[in-house]
Amino acid sequence: MDVVLFTARDGALHVLLVATGSPTPRDRWTLPSGAIRRGESIDDTALRIARDALGTAPTHLDQAGMRGGARRTAQPVVTVAYSGLAPVGTPARAGAAWLPLSEAGALAIRDRDEIDRSIAAIRARIDHQPIAFRLLPDVFTLSELQAVYEILLGRPLHKASFRRSLHAAAIVEATDEWRTERRGRPAQLFRYAPPRRRRHRRGVRFDLLG
């Protein structure tokens, strides 16, 4: 099983890698992986692998797919992949590192393929699951939320359209807290509004936000 963990750092998406000890540059780093133990569900296995790699539990973890074929041994295997998220600012523990996604081309083909599949899985679910909020603290500004959506989607979003879509989807609620941003203007803080607080569950229409 492979676990592809992402976070946002310096305005870009990063993926967590673990050192292999291999002298070959392309195989020096790889995705966190492991085998399913006896009596363990695949969800439990993914969580264990993620915890071992991160040093803490991810804030989002979901199955991204599976594929057959030879992996790291000569025997045919079925590899299950999970994608996960860690909050902004999560450090890499000893023996691991956060690699900018733009540099993933230096990895082995099998790892690049898993990363691509995991990103596609996240983007397919982002408009109907609170995935973007898993990268943020409990309260945040709308600018911070938009930045996270842009990082995950890999494209810019129109500010006014983004906020109208958030309002229509009713997925955030205002708090009484404010924070001064870079330009010195106070910005109101918001929090994620769980489904039980919403009268409807409309998704965020990103096809309208170009």
PLM region descriptions:
Residues A174-G210:
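Long, intrinsically disordered, low-complexity Ser/Thr/Pro-rich regulatory/activation regions
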Residues M1-W29:
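N-terminal strand-loop-strand
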Residues L5-T7, L17, S83-L85, L189-R191:
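Short, well-ordered beta-strand micro-motif
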Residues A81-G84, P91-I126, D138-S143, V148, ...:
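NUDIX/MutT-family hydrolases
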Residues A147-P156:
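Short helix-coil junctions and helix-kink-helix linkers
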Residues L31-G39, R134:
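Short histidine-centered catalytic/ligand-binding loop motif
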Residues M1, H14, D43-L47, R51-A92, ...:
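Active-site segment of metal-dependent pyrophosphate-handling enzymes
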